[in-house]
C-alpha cells in the first residue's frame, strides 16, 4: 500500500551529508521508498494513507554498527573498584574482567540471555535505532558462541529492528586454552566458524587484533577461514597499540576496522583504498579515560568513511544511547554533527554491508526513518540524554515500543 508522509523537513544523508529537503514529502510503497522530494513536486495520485508529520525533521533510522549486546552478568562492581584504586590487573587476577563475563555468559540460559539483551536493545530502539549489529565473543567455545548467536537471531525475529549477527570467537583467549592461542585459532577456523556458518547464524566475522588478544598473523588465519566460507570480515584494531591491524583489514577488504585510536596515516591510506569504514567508538574512549585520539585529520584527508557506534558491552562501554555517542564523537573527537549523523546512518550501513538498502533516504531504499520534533538535525548530537519526541517508521510502518 502507498503511504504519504508529509509536512516535514528531511535530512536524507545521501552521499554522507545532510542533503536537506525543506517542506518535503515521502511516499512509501510497502517497505520501500517510492518517492521523496519537495512537497510542491509531489506526484498527483491517490494515497490511501496520509500521515502529517507536523513539521518534524526526518532522518534515516539510526544504525548502531558495533555492539556486544548479548552477555551474562554485570561488571558495575568492577567499575566501582577501579574508581577506588584497584587496578585492572588486580581485578583480572581475582577472576574479574572479561573472564567474569565469559563465566556468566556460559552459565546463563538462552532465555536468560535473551531477556537481558532485549532490555538493552529496547533502550537503543527508544533512541531511534532501527538497525543494529550484535557480536558474539563472550562464549569462546562452540556451544556458548552458538547460544549467543541463537539469541541474536531470536532478538531479530521478536523485536521490530533489523539485526546483523557477527561471530567474534577471536575476542579473547578462553581459560581452557591458556597459553595456547594458536591452538584456539585453529579451533575457531577448523570447527567453530564452519559449524556456526552452516547453521546460518553468522553474517560476518570479527576478531580482536591487539597485544592482549591476537596477533595480526593469527587474525589473518581467521580472515582466510571466514572468506573461504563466503563471510565478510571486520576487525577491532589499534585500540591500545599499533599493530597495523587496520591495514590488515584493508588487505582483506574488511567491511570495517573499529576503535583505531593508534592507527597511523599509512593505515588510513590503506583503508581508503579498500573503502573499509573506520568505526569510531567514543563510549569506550570515554569510559576508559583514554587520551590518544583517533587520527581524525588523516581519516578526513584520505576520505575514509567514518561511522560511530555505541560498542555496548559490560566492560568498556556500557552505553545504552547511540545519540549520546554522537555527542561524544563531537566533543571528544571534534567531529561535526553532520559527520556524526552520517556516522550513525549511511556510513554505519556501509560498515554492515547494507549501504545499498539502508542508511539514507533515497528512492528504492528501505523505508526506515525517524521523524524527530527538533529544531535542526544538529540537535541529535547536541542534547545529552533524555528521550526526544519522535515517530519511528520501520519498513514503511510506524513502530512503537
Swiss-Prot record:
Record's subcellular location: Cytoplasm
Entry annotated with the keyword Plastid: no
Entry's EC annotation: 3.5.2.7
Reactions that this protein is recorded to catalyse: 4-imidazolone-5-propanoate + H2O = N-formimidoyl-L-glutamate
Keywords of this entry: Cytoplasm, Histidine metabolism, Hydrolase, Iron, Metal-binding, Zinc
Pfam families named in the record: Amidohydro_1 (PF01979)
Binding site for 4-imidazolone-5-propanoate: 75, 138, 171, 239, 316
GO cellular component: cytoplasm
Ranges in a coiled coil: none
Cofactor(s) needed by this chain: Zn(2+); Fe(3+)
Matching CDD domains: Imidazolone-5PH
Residues that hold N-formimidoyl-L-glutamate according to the record: 138, 313, 315
Binding site for Fe(3+): 66, 68, 236, 311
Record: residues binding Zn(2+): 66, 68, 236, 311
Any one biological process term the GO annotation gives: L-histidine catabolic process to glutamate and formamide
Family: Belongs to the metallo-dependent hydrolases superfamily. HutI family.
Role this protein plays: Catalyzes the hydrolytic cleavage of the carbon-nitrogen bond in imidazolone-5-propanoate to yield N-formimidoyl-L-glutamate. It is the third step in the universal histidine degradation pathway.
Protein name: Imidazolonepropionase
Organism: Pseudomonas fluorescens (strain Pf0-1)
Lineage, highest ranks first: Bacteria, Pseudomonadati, Pseudomonadota, Gammaproteobacteria, Pseudomonadales
Amino acid at each position: 500500500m502507498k503511504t504519504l508522509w508529509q509536512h516535514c523537513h528531511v535530512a536524507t544523508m545521501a552521499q554522507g551529508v545532510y542533503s536537506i529537503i525543506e517542506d518535503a514529502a515521502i511516499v512509501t510503497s510497502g517497505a520501500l521508498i517510492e518517492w521523496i522530494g519537495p512537497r510542491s513536486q509531489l506526484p498527483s495520485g491517490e494515497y490511501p494513507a496520509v500521515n502529517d508529520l507536523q513539521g518534524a525533521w526526518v532522518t534515516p533510522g539510526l544504525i548502531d554498527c558495533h555492539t556486544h549486546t548479548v552477555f551474562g552478568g554485570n561488571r558495575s562492581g568492577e567499575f566501582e573498584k577501579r574508581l577506588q584504586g584497584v587496578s585492572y590487573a588486580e581485578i583480572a587476577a581475582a577472576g574479574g574482567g572479561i573472564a567474569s563475563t565469559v563465566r556468566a555468559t556460559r552459565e546463563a540460559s538462552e532465555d536468560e540471555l535473551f531477556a537481558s539483551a532485549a532490555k538493552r536493545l529496547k533502550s537503543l530502539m527508544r533512541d531511534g535505532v532501527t538497525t543494529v549489529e550484535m557480536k558474539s565473543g563472550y562464549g569462546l567455545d562452540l556451544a556458548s558462541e552458538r547460544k549467543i548467536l541463537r539469541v541474536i537471531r531470536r532478538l531479530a525475529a521478536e523485536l521490530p529492528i533489523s539485526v546483523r549477527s557477527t561471530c567474534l570467537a577471536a575476542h579473547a583467549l578462553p581459560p581452557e586454552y591458556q597459553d595456547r592461542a594458536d591452538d584456539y585459532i585453529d579451533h575457531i577456523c577448523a570447527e567453530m566458524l564452519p559449524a556456526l556458518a552452516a547453521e546460518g547464524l553468522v553474517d560476518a566475522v570479527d576478531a580482536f587484533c591487539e597485544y592482549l588478544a591476537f596477533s595480526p598473523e593469527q587474525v589473518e588465519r581467521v580472515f582466510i577461514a571466514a572468506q573461504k566460507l563466503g563471510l565478510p570480515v571486520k576487525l577491532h584494531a589499534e585500540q591500545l597499540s599499533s599493530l597495523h591491524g587496520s591495514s590488515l583489514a584493508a588487505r582483506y577488504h574488511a567491511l570495517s576496522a573499529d576503535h583505531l585510536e593508534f592507527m597511523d596515516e599509512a593505515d588510513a591510506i590503506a583503508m581508503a583504498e579498500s573503502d573499509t569504514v573506520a568505526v569510531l567508538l567514543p563510549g569506550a574512549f570515554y569510559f576508559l579515560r583514554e587520551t590518544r585520539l583517533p587520527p581524525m585529520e588523516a581519516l578526513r584527508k584520505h576520505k575514509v568513511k567514518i561511522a560511530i557506534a555505541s560498542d555496548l558491552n559490560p566492560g568498556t562501554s556500557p552505553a545504552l544511547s547511540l545519540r549520546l555517542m554522537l555527542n561524544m564523537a563531537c566533543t571528544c573527537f571534534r567531529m561535526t554533527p553532520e559527520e556524526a549523523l552520517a556516522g550513525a546512518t549511511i556510513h554505519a550501513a556501509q560498515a554492515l554491508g547494507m549501504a545499498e538498502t539502508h542508511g539514507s533516504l533515497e528512492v528504492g531504499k528501505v523505508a526506515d526513518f525517524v521523524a524527530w520534533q527538533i529544531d535542526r538535525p544538529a540537535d541529535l548530537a547536541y542534547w545529552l540524554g533524555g528521550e526526544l519526541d519522535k515517530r519511528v517508521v520501520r519498513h514503511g510502518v510506524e513502530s512503537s515500543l
